[in-house]
């Protein structure tokens, strides 16, 4: 009985293959799924092939097939890096607290943020102590409080992160100023103890 149709199914989409008489193969150009396969079992999309003859009998081969299954697995990588955003402090801010809580958010809408890649640097020095990473939809909200008071003056915080597909976000920075010293007031007139009429 002759083969009538051959179909390839992946990510819920079905594609019809065309017979190539010159090679004796069924072929099709199939677009990859639009989303990363990281969240799939084994981090790969599993496909299946269904061959149907003229009588309606069909044979299905999927990723669990011992011989051909590995050829039906597809790894799809996203190309968009995570998004980084500072919550506090804002750029150019003057802060009287020498140990401010640095807060920022890292999000990625596809393969997801790899929390092990989140890095904070204070004035170019990587923070090696632990900081808070709270899972939220699409990523993490993070907070870091310096263990040692920052000196008065300008400071720059930078943050970095990558997703599970290896896309690294461009480091984001914020510069602010610590100012813990109140202004000095000097009275120039009238002189102390002056009596006038």
Enumerate the predicted regions with their spans.
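Extracellular acidic, Ser/Thr/Pro-rich low-complexity tracts
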Residues: 1, 51-53, 78, 104-112, ...
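Solvent-exposed loop/turn segments flanking beta-strands in beta-repeat/beta-sandwich domains
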Residues: 1-10, 97, 108-122
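Aromatic sugar-binding surface patches on proteins
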Residues: 21-34, 135-144
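Surface-exposed, short loops/turns at beta-strand junctions within beta-sandwich domains
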Residues: 32-45, 147-154
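Short, solvent-exposed loop/turn segments at the edges of extracellular beta-sandwich modules
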Residues: 52-62, 162-167
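Flexible, low-complexity linkers/stalks enriched in Thr/Pro that connect modular domains
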Residues: 65-85, 172-186
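Short, solvent-exposed loop/linker segments at the N-terminal edge
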Residues: 92-98, 193-197
């Amino acid at each position: 009985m002759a083969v009538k149709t051959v179909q390839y199914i992946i990510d819920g989409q079905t594609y019809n293959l065309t017979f190539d008489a010159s090679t004796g193969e069924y072929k099709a150009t199939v677009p990859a799924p639009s989303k990363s396969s990281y969240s799939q079992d084994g981090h790969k999309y599993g496909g299946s092939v269904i061959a149907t003859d003229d009588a309606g009998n069909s044979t299905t081969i999927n990723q669990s097939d011992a011989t051909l299954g590995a050829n039906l697995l597809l790894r799809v990588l996203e190309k968009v890096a995570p998004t980084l955003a500072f919550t506090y402090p804002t750029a150019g801010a003057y802060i009287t607290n020498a140990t401010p809580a640095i807060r920022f958010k890292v999000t990625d809408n596809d393969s997801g943020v790899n929390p092990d890649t989140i890095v904070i640097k204070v004035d170019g020095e990587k923070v090696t102590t632990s900081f808070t990473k709270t899972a939220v939809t699409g990523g993490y909200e993070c907070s870091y409080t310096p263990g040692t008071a920052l000196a008065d003056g300008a400071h720059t915080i930078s943050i970095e992160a990558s997703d599970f597909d290896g896309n690294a976000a461009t480091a984001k920075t914020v510069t602010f100023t610590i100012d813990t010293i109140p202004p000095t007031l000097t009275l120039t007139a009238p002189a102390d103890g002056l009596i006038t009429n």
